């Protein structure tokens, strides 16, 4: 029997340190709810889960971008609804003026309303804005010379974007006024013949507006479908990231209980090992 080196005590002390570290790790995982709290816990798992987290954040922002896009489209469509109503009213007045029972003076009075409505079409086009940007003056037309585009980033990665094109919806672009801005240059209802020609012009204008509204509806449907897909992708990534990173509480509690018992046993065995040297004393008496 030796007394200078108590190997049993040293072994018990080393195991006590190991078990105590295990308990501390269990407590950290149980209190944080995460299996990986630092790179040392699982280096590869941390790298993969961090990539997933960045992707999830990107998808969540893409969802917001899509919501902004839908709001932009709905605002534009609302202005075009007003334009459609005005064009419908002008067409109604043109049909009225084409009727032979009205005098030239009557048609002049009708023309006054038509001219005011044409001015309103221009007012809507110039005042239709979203976040300070004009929407109906051709800034975002496919053939725009301004060089501006309306682009929405609808994904979490590079080049995952979609463009929205909005044509010019001014009175001149719709054929309601001439190149000099004279409301009577192209749309006059001063006679039954000119009123009849105005009906054809208005039909063409309504076709342009309705096509633009249909395009906006298609854009919105696409965005809404993209939002659903992004939502599903985000959910799946969060589920996968949870499997990698989150704590399995039931399993961790079992491990925590085991390590607590081992720690208590190590403390007891360390106490026993420290008393072994006292067995030498009877030999010396």
Swiss-Prot record:
Keywords: Bacterial flagellum, Glycoprotein, Periplasm. One of its GO terms (molecular function) is structural molecule activity. It comes from the Bacteria. Disulfide bonds: none annotated. GO terms for cellular component: periplasmic flagellum. InterPro entries: Flagellin, Flagellin_C, Flagellin_C_sub2, Flagellin_N. Pfam families: Flagellin_C, Flagellin_N. Gene3D superfamilies: f41 fragment of flagellin, middle domain (2.170.280.10), f41 fragment of flagellin, N-terminal domain (1.20.1330.10), Flagellar export chaperone, C-terminal domain (6.10.10.10). Glycosylated. Glycosylation is not essential for motility. The keyword Glycoprotein applies. It is found in: Periplasmic flagellum; Periplasm. The core of the flagellum consists of several antigenically related polypeptides. Belongs to the bacterial flagellin family. Component of the core of the flagella. This is Flagellar filament 30.7 kDa core protein. It comes from Treponema maltophilum.
């Amino acid at each position: 029997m030796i007394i200078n080196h108590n190997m049993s005590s040293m072994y018990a002390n080393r195991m006590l340190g190991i078990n105590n570290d295990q308990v501390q790790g269990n407590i950290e995982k149980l209190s944080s709810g995460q299996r990986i709290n630092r790179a040392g816990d699982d280096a590869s798992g941390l790298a993969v889960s961090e990539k997933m987290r960045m992707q999830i954040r990107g998808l969540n922002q893409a969802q917001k971008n899509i919501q902004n896009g839908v709001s932009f489209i709905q605002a534009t469509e609302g202005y075009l609804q007003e334009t459609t109503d005005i064009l419908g009213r002008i067409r109604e007045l043109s049909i009225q003026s084409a009727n032979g029972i009205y005098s030239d003076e009557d048609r002049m009075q009708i023309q006054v309303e038509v001219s005011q409505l044409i001015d309103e079409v221009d007012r809507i086009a110039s005042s239709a804005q979203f976040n300070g940007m004009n929407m109906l003056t051709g800034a975002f037309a496919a053939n725009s010379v301004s060089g501006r585009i309306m682009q929405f980033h609808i994904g979490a990665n590079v080049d995952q974007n979609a463009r929205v094109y909005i044509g010019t919806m001014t009175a001149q672009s719709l054929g309601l006024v001439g190149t000099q801005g004279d409301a009577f240059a192209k749309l006059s209802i001063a006679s039954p013949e000119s009123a009849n020609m105005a009906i054809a012009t208005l039909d063409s204008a309504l076709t342009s507006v309705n096509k633009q509204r249909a395009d906006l509806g298609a854009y919105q449907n696409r965005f809404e479908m993209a939002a659903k897909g992004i939502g599903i992708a985000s959910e799946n990534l969060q589920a996968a990231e949870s499997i990698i990173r989150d704590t399995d509480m039931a399993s961790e509690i079992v491990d925590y209980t085991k390590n607590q018992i081992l720690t208590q046993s190590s403390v007891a065995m360390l106490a026993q090992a420290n008393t072994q040297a006292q067995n030498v004393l009877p030999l010396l008496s």
